[in-house]
Curated annotation (Swiss-Prot):
GO cellular component annotations of the record: cytosolic small ribosomal subunit
Disulfide pattern: none
Pfam family name, one: Ribosomal_S17
A GO biological process held by the record: translation
Function: One of the primary rRNA binding proteins, it binds specifically to the 5'-end of 16S ribosomal RNA.
Organism: Streptomyces griseus subsp. griseus (strain JCM 4626 / CBS 651.72 / NBRC 13350 / KCC S-0626 / ISP 5235)
GO MF term list: rRNA binding; structural constituent of ribosome
Record text on subunit structure and interactions: Part of the 30S ribosomal subunit.
Designated name of the protein: Small ribosomal subunit protein uS17
Amino acid sequence: MSEKTVTETNTDRGFRKTREGLVVSDKMDKTVVVAVEDRVKHALYGKVIRRTNKLKAHDEQNSAGVGDRVLIMETRPLSASKRWRIVEILEKAK
């Protein structure tokens, strides 16, 4: 029975997307812009193309700086364009 209650509490929160990216701007208060790279294969020619999305992520402690590699997770809308938050800083900029 205890195992069943544990699985139920895990499913309450639901699945959230995570992405890894590079911080390209930290000029806003408690917000960073993260560039997330995605590699896709061209449908007709087969060449691998790099596509980059820039996402605004919430940084509560203002700890991330430009050049840091971070892990971000999807969250509820925090502003008009901010729907991600920083989970951890994987690598600090050199």
